[in-house]
């Protein structure tokens, strides 16, 4: 099924955390040994830290480590073989979801006023996720 919208974001995450949900919600900080922390209308992900590399300079700047987040806005849930790390519903009254960290946010269309976030990964590393899929699914009612 074709997504309503799809965004892939690959970049260094200098805080080691990616935030998905309401951009003004209080970001959860207690991961309790997990890779995902769920708050009110927001989810925080422990992603590969930008400094998780051998320290090499490239053209006068650091060659930072990156993590990639694939975000899809879907009409209905799709079955996946990836490990599901989180399945929660957030309020999206503006019909948008923000993805980012303190360095910047990207706004993505949400499929409804309440959105189910299904977060999965095919490579779950306890030091931080390197590839993450975030499916946004409309919640009826």
Regions found by a protein language model. Name each.
Residues 75-103:
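Extended, solvent-exposed segments with strong compositional bias
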Residues 38, 110-112:
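Surface-exposed coil/turn segments at beta-strand junctions on protein surfaces, enriched
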Residues 120-124:
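Short beta-strand-plus-loop segments that form exposed binding edges in beta-rich domains
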Residues 1-79, 125-141:
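Primarily secretory-pathway and cell-envelope proteins
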Residues 97, 119, 134-136:
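Generic hydrophobic secondary-structure signal
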Residues 113-117:
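A short tyrosine-centered beta-strand micro-motif
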């Amino acid at each position: 099924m074709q997504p309503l919208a799809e965004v892939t974001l690959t970049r260094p995450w200098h805080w080691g955390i990616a935030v998905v949900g309401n951009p003004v919600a209080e970001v959860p900080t207690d991961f309790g040994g997990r890779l995902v922390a769920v708050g009110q209308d927001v989810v925080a992900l422990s992603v590969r830290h930008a400094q998780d590399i051998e320290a090499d300079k490239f053209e006068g700047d650091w060659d930072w480590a990156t993590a990639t987040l694939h975000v899809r806005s879907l009409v209905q849930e799709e079955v996946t073989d990836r490990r599901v790390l989180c399945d929660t519903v957030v309020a999206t009254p503006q019909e948008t979801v923000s993805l980012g960290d303190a360095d910047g946010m990207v706004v993505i269309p949400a499929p409804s006023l309440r959105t189910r976030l299904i977060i999965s990964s095919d490579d779950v590393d306890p030091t931080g996720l390197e590839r993450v899929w975030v499916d946004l699914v409309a919640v009826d009612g």
